[in-house]
Amino acid sequence: YWFGYGSRSVRLWLRLFDQKGSELASWIERLPDSAAGFAIDSEQIRKTYDTGPFTGQLFIHVLNATGHDVVKYALDVYDDDGDTLSCTHDANAWPAELYAGLPAPDTGERVTLWIQNSHPTKIPSNSIGLNRMGSRDVFRFEKDIAPFASHGLDIGASLPQLSWPEQIEIQA
């Protein structure tokens, strides 16, 4: 990608964080000096760094980038049974105050909102809220999220009165 903007010797500096925001591993990957895709294989990372199953996030910093230097979000969720569906939202580190479109769970479903803090400072308790679309009654998440930590918020447990096809707004 960056090769098309004239970049050469592009490298990725990567840091893997666990769910609590602690560093699991750091390493550098060299990208080819040609137009090419690049994959980061989470199964290989787990083997290389002996992490076992975990929840966390991968911070990617692009070195020697020319032009556009944004790396978009990637989500990796494994489900051996094929019963898990994942989706992502734009991963800008500058959040809006309101996001919409998260579905309430249907009967027998579990919807998890993954809150990932991509900053070196905590997200304070009560600064994230959920509500039924259009409602002023807001559920506030009452825990801090540590720097670079991740938290899976169970939507059904947080808003048990809501169900599909209702939609949820996320207050940030």
Predicted features by range, described:
Residues 1-172:
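Gly/Pro-rich, tryptophan- and cysteine-flecked surface segments typical
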